[in-house]
Every structure is written in structure tokens, then in C-alpha cells.
Amino acid sequence: MLSHLADLQDYFGPLRLLRYITVRTLLAAVTSLTIGFVIAPWLIAKFRELKLGHGYIDDRTGALGATYFDKKNTPTMGGLIIFLSVFTSAALWAAPNIWVFVSLFVYAALTIPGWRDDYLKVVHKNRNGISSWEKIGWQSLATVVALGLLLWHPASAQKIREFWVPFVKYPLIPHMHWAVLLVLIYLWIVGFSNAINLTDGLDGLAIGCTIPVALVFGIMAYVADHVFLSQYLLTSHVPGTGELAVICGALIGGCMAFLWYNCHPAEVFMGDTGSLALGGLIGVMAFMIHQPLTLVIVGGVFVAEMLSVVVQVGVFKITKRRSGVGRRFFLMAPVHHHFQKKGWPETKVVLRFWVLSLGCALAGLATLKLR
């Protein structure tokens, strides 16, 4: 929106800087950071006043339950802090185009079921929240509408059909059938939506791991939009996706503001309101800039968390079917709880996972040069 102020540069010269994506990305980060710091104390106080916190300790934590006693009644729905910060900042500083619109649509659409899930848990004391089918329904609807918009708009109709993989300097699939495209984009949006949701189990863990992912994809979005850089690095050129770097800037600022209040001991939890939407936003952006498999590398911590649950459930079912007694591969899943069971303090688990996330992000960024 504010990018159009650059048209007034004849009246005020410095406004010409708004033509540069890098400048608006920085402004988006500062804006979302500021909004987050302004609204977070008020929202946290309001959540406490309304008693919008989990009033129970999850039985699945077992012996870890005592560790979480101090977190009982900590306000949740903190994802609203991130959403208001990121969405407002991105809407202000990103130049409107189909890529921006679809990204913000997916982000908003997946915030709704997350908020509803948290609402049922903290207001109606429904420990299960929304049903799995309702959650899948929302995620499916968001995916179908997003893909429909991308296939309808002339600026994205052809580009979105290309499928690129790391280390290869041409599209592996130049023109995907819409049905194949639907399956793939669904897997990325829903997969990473649920992956971040599973990772959000310790103070600051999920949000801290999201920041390096957003930083790397901001760089990749800028490269994809830049004619010279995309040609030099032999990556896909997707005109207009540079504006996604502005969204990533807003995401970094919003996450940093939230982390200030979510670090141990957390004053607020993001809840499903934040985690489901963040995963969907990152997933759809990765797909639109033709870096879906790179996300598997960059978001390695999230992938590991999700796979740990899949392995745990799979091993338990297989061993129970064969011997009648289910066995577990990990002491507890997701894997961050496994390390807690081994005696690691919560802060050590979180900090080490942050280090791993940064390493994964740098490894994914390095793939730009390897073709």
C-alpha cells in the first residue's frame, strides 16, 4: 500500500526509496516489531483478565507434568499478536500482487481454525479443540482457493505449474497437471502447518526456529524476482515474488516481538492460532518461489519434529500388531520431549534446537549456489 508513495518522489525525494524491495523489507520488519511490542502487553493482560489460558496439564507429558505446573493458566491465543503484527505490516509495505494476496489469504484463512481450536480449549474447556476433520477441512479449503487464484491469474498461471528441485538448473517438471499441483501444494501447506504446530511445545521453540526460516526465504524470494541474480545462480525467475521478501521481513519482526514474551518462562503461548497459520504461510511461499524441497532442508527442525511423531506412532502400531505389546522408538514424541525425558533442561533443548534450525537454514541457503 505505502509503496505507492514512491510516485510522489517529485514532491519529496526520499520517497523514491520505497521503490526498493530491500528498503520496504526493513521497514516491514521494524513496523511489525513495533506493533508487536505495542499490542503484546495489552493483549496478554486482556487474555489474563478473560482467563484465556489452559487450565490443565496435558496427561501425555507423564512425568514431565510437574515441569509444566508453573505454565498452567498461562495465556494462549498469542498467535493473534503475531498475526496482527505481520498482516498489518505486510499489507502496508508490500506492493499488491497475486503472490502477496495468496500468501496473506492463506495466513488469514489458517488463523481462523487455529483461533477456533484455542477458543474451544480455553473458553469451553474442550481439551480436544476442533476435530481433526474440521481442521483438515479448513486447510483443504485454504489450499484449493489459493491454488485456484494462482491458476486463474495470468501472472502466476504458468509459473506455478513448474516444479523445481535443489541442485538442478532447470524445472524437473515444466508443466504440472493441476491435479498433481493440487496434491503437492496441499502437502506443503498442510504438512508445514502441522509441523510447526507439533514443534510448538516448549517456550520459544517454534517461534525461535521460524525466524531463520523466514530470513532465508526472504532472501530466496528476492533472488527469484531478480532477473540478474536468478540467471547468475541458475534458479527459477518468478517476477513479482520479491514482494514476498517484504512479508518475510514482517514475519521476522513479528516473531521477534512475540519471542520477547514467549521465551522461558513464557508470558504467553502462541497456540494453534499462531502455529497453524505460520506453517501454512511458509509452505505456500516456498512453493510459489519454486523452493518447496529446499524448505525440507531449511525447515529441518520442523521436519524432524513431524517425522518423530510419524515414526513413534508407526513403530508402536507395528510392534503391537506383531507382539501384542506396543513399543516406542522415542521416550516421547515430538522429539523435543524425548530430550526432556533424557534429563535435558527445557532451555537447553530450545537453544540447541535454535542452533540446529540456524544450521539447517544456512545449509538450505547454500543450495542456491550449488547447481
UniProtKB/Swiss-Prot annotation:
The keyword Cell wall biogenesis/degradation applies. One of its GO terms (molecular function) is UDP-N-acetylmuramoyl-L-alanyl-D-glutamyl-meso-2,6-diaminopimelyl-D-alanyl-D-alanine:undecaprenyl-phosphate transferase activity. It is a multi-pass membrane protein. The keyword DNA-binding does not apply. InterPro entries: Glycosyl_transferase_4 (IPR000715), PNAcMuramoyl-5peptid_Trfase (IPR003524), PNAcMuramoyl-5peptid_Trfase_CS (IPR018480). One of its GO terms (biological process) is cell wall organization. The chain crosses the membrane at residues 25-45, 77-94, 136-156, 172-192, 204-224, 240-260, 269-289, 296-316, 348-368. It comes from the Bacteria. GO terms for cellular component: plasma membrane. Its cofactor is Mg(2+). Keywords: Cell cycle, Cell division, Cell inner membrane, Cell membrane, Cell shape, Cell wall biogenesis/degradation, Magnesium, Membrane, Metal-binding, Peptidoglycan synthesis, Transferase, Transmembrane, Transmembrane helix. Pathway: Cell wall biogenesis; peptidoglycan biosynthesis. Belongs to the glycosyltransferase 4 family. MraY subfamily. PANTHER family: PHOSPHO-N-ACETYLMURAMOYL-PENTAPEPTIDE-TRANSFERASE, PHOSPHO-N-ACETYLMURAMOYL-PENTAPEPTIDE-TRANSFERASE HOMOLOG. NCBIfam families: mraY. This is Phospho-N-acetylmuramoyl-pentapeptide-transferase. The gene is mraY.
